[in-house]
Amino acid sequence: PDEAARKVKAVAAAVPPRAVLGIAGPGDGAYDWAKTRETFARVAAELPDLKLCLSTNGLALPERVEELKAMNVAHVTVTINMVDPHVGEAIHPWIFHDHRRHTGLEAARILHARQMESLERLAEADILVKVNSVLIPGINDDHMADVHQAVTARGAFLHNIMPLIARAE
């Protein structure tokens, strides 16, 4: 948090006008919540005009929504690559949730449920939501229309689909 706050201040001073601070890693900002919350608090105290944004996969997000609203986080970006757990198990073979590792279809079902809950809670809290999806040829390319329908129905104001471009090694 100290290093992040220093870097934000330096960039904000060098590149006006400043608009948005997004936390997107390392790791998942909603999962490593103590560091994310502290970074947001320090930056907001020193640069109150800066808008705050969180990027996450949504797994740890539902419990953070009320705090995000209280901290005046302007918007949240959630990466959602599937809404069918059968598709999801090929993309997300495992997750770590509730202090344990989940694998396969169970992992994809949990991730999907948590992502949809996150979108619904963010919409209820009037926090703008953008969804990013990675289109993976042969895995979820035929599934993007379903993803789009599900996320926009739950309040996403923008759905950004980005193709995975794999290169041979």
Name each model feature, range by range.
Residues P1-I23, A30-T39, A45-E46:
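Conserved alpha-helical substructure of the radical SAM core
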Residues A30-M162, R167:
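Conserved AdoMet/S-adenosylmethionine-binding subsite of the radical SAM
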